């Protein structure tokens, strides 16, 4: 097996709608590593009312971004508990100061970057419409309503969430690019950036899978044998 006995320290990056969540869950299903999502970690700490959770909530409540040092403390505190396993960081580091702070404590072996054209992401994210009363979700591409803009069951109008409106999506994608471009350049210079480009998650995944086979042991679950 190409995977060495050394524990893998990995990061996954990708814009909202790039399929990062799907790829991350497939990685943890097939390989012996722990997936650490900064968003999940944040919610968990806020729910438990930890010191860092309370601090983070004060920024969120004011509509502000959580400062780099708070996010770094949050991630490093959790990573301290994961000394015996390989891990995949998702959502952190998101800025250059976060990447540099992480670097002082851990040597990152590989950064998986999902490079999906913004136009494709925009189509994915803006295709979602919902029926507010029931929470029913329609996707114009994969699961469209029988009549455009109308709920199948009630005949009531569908709405588009603020987050899914084209102008909001474009703003989010531009903000992501501005924030993460320096991080990608930083890891590129270190020689650990692996970029996987494509328009479909199912076509990108086999390349990510082959790459990780050389880096980390696969899970020995029987499920991988069954079709």
From Swiss-Prot:
Q: Which residues carry this modification: Phosphoserine?
A: 37
> Which compartments does it reside in?
Mitochondrion matrix
Catalytically driven reaction(s): a ribonucleoside 5'-triphosphate + AMP = a ribonucleoside 5'-diphosphate + ADP; GTP + AMP = GDP + ADP; ITP + AMP = IDP + ADP
Question: Per its UniProt record, what SUPFAM superfamilies does this chain match?
Answer: Microbial and mitochondrial ADK, insert 'zinc finger' domain (SSF57774), P-loop containing nucleoside triphosphate hydrolases (SSF52540)
The residues that hold GTP are: 17, 19-22, 128, 138-139, 161, 172, 201
- InterPro entries attached to this UniProt entry: Adenyl_kin_sub, Adenylat/UMP-CMP_kin, Adenylat_kinase_CS, Adenylate_kinase_lid-dom, ADK_active_lid_dom_sf, AK3/Ak4_mitochondrial, P-loop_NTPase
Identify one Gene Ontology CC term for this UniProt entry. Answer: mitochondrion
* Region annotation (NMP) ranges: 37-66
Q: Which residues carry this modification: N6-acetyllysine?
A: 29, 34, 64, 80, 174, 189, 203
Q: Which GO terms describe its molecular function?
A: adenylate kinase activity; ATP binding; GTP binding; nucleoside triphosphate adenylate kinase activity
- Domain of life of the source: Eukaryota
Q: How does it associate, per the subunit comment?
A: Monomer.
The protein depicted here goes by the name GTP:AMP phosphotransferase AK3, mitochondrial
Give the organism, scientific name.
Answer: Mus musculus
Q: What broad taxonomic lineage does this protein's source fall under?
A: Eukaryota, Metazoa, Chordata, Craniata, Vertebrata
User: What gene makes this protein?
Assistant: Ak3
